[in-house]
A protein has these predicted regions:
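Class I S-adenosyl-L-methionine
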Residues: 1-177
């Protein structure tokens, strides 16, 4: 399995290093493109067409080649899209293995950030809207509890999440199309 996290892989997060932060983002296949809906409000919010999934390198294909996802979505044929689908398949099919790999990568990411004198921050919903606060790991009620000194942040269209208790190190911003 390839890596799950993208570390400072876009211009916006690279700029954060000047402010003292190193960012790791998890990009999965959004909405229903993996065959499982990872963005529960995508249809209602009307954001499938404008999704970041095909922005940047995710939108560049080999020539004009495309491929069809398990849900029937047609996407640019590139390694970015195929990696997002592979990550999503692992998440959907073997959550314990996915969470173990995620913990391993966050641990390595923290060490990398600390070596550079930067503060690690993690965004788990780069192109998804998963309720991570409800997904247990082998050792904790959620991934944020496993890394209580690390700041996690996400954007969500599931407004009900903001009315519920969240881990102290998890910041959610409501984002609606």
């Amino acid at each position: 399995m390839a890596t799950l996290l993208n570390i400072d892989s876009n211009a916006k997060t690279i700029k954060g290093q000047k402010q003292g932060f190193m960012t790791a983002i998890l990009y999965l296949a959004p909405a229903n493109s993996s065959g499982v809906n990872l963005c529960p409000m995508a249809k209602q919010a009307g954001c499938e067409a404008g999704c970041l999934n095909t922005a940047g390198r995710g939108g560049i294909s080999k020539g004009s080649k495309t491929f069809t996802t398990p849900s029937g979505a047609v996407l640019p044929d590139n390694t970015v899209q195929r990696a997002r689908l592979a990550r999503s398949a692992l998440f959907n099919d073997d959550k314990p293995a996915f969470m173990a790999q995620l913990k391993k990568e966050i641990t390595a990411f923290i060490k990398k950030a600390q070596k550079k004198g930067l503060t690690p921050v993690v965004r788990l919903n780069g192109t998804s809207d998963i309720l991570w606060e409800n997904i247990p790991t082998a050792t904790a009620p959620n991934i944020m509890a496993d890394f209580s000194t690390v700041q996690f942040y996400d954007y969500t269209k599931v407004y009900q999440r903001l009315a519920r208790p969240l881990p102290a190190n998890y910041d959610l911003s409501l984002s609606y199309s």
